[in-house]
Regions:
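N-terminal active-site wall of soluble small-molecule enzyme domains
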Residues: 1-57, 61-70
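Active-site loop/helix belt of alpha/beta enzymes
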Residues: 1-13, 68, 72-73, 79-82, ...
């Protein structure tokens, strides 16, 4: 299960951060004594924002509603909520749409500007990294374009930029950036 794997990763291998799909998985790890930073990659309903803050989790954000809920929950707790912003570079699932880098950068900057949030990272996910190299590289370029717009227009940079999951870790070292998943 997840708990023995997380313990081995944290206590024996010393990984910097863990990532899970949902709040329930993160809560299970915290309950088991895992203290490493945990990033929730999936969506969390805004009504559970206080749980994210109370457990000291980092939440993926791609909607104003969730960003506002996290900001309010963190403010009420006297804390800052760690967030990673999701950029949709072609998966067509979640995130600021990168096919318009200026618009995506504006949307992301507005989310980051909310009080009581601590923007730690930004990421995308490749649709077919184990298949279509051309499309994977197009997605990577789109992601870099959004990052460039964020820095040039808003002076915003991120400590952690990531996009490489399993297939990209093996096939595309140039996509590793600051973290792999």
């Amino acid at each position: 299960g997840a708990v023995p794997v997380a313990r081995a990763l944290e206590w024996e291998l010393g990984v910097d951060q863990l990532a899970v799909a949902c709040l329930e998985e993160a809560a299970e790890l915290r309950k088991a004594g895992i203290t490493a930073p945990i990033l929730i990659l999936g969506y969390t309903q805004p009504e559970f924002a206080a749980d994210v803050v109370d457990l000291g989790l980092t939440q993926t954000v791609f909607t104003p509603e969730l960003a506002r809920a996290l900001s309010e929950a963190a403010g009420a707790a006297g804390k800052r909520a760690g967030i990673h912003l999701k950029v949709d570079t072609g998966m067509s699932r979640l995130g600021a749409l990168a096919h318009e880098p200026e618009s995506a950068a504006r949307e992301i900057d507005a989310l980051c500007a909310l009080p009581h949030l601590r923007p730690e990272g930004i990421f995308t996910h490749f649709a077919d990294a184990d298949g279509d190299e051309g499309y994977t590289m197009l997605q990577f370029t789109r992601f870099l374009d959004v990052l460039a717009q964020l820095e040039e227009k808003y002076g915003r940079t991120f400590e952690i930029r990531h996009c490489a999951a399993s297939a990209a870790v093996l096939k595309y070292p140039c996509t590793h950036l600051d973290m792999v998943r």
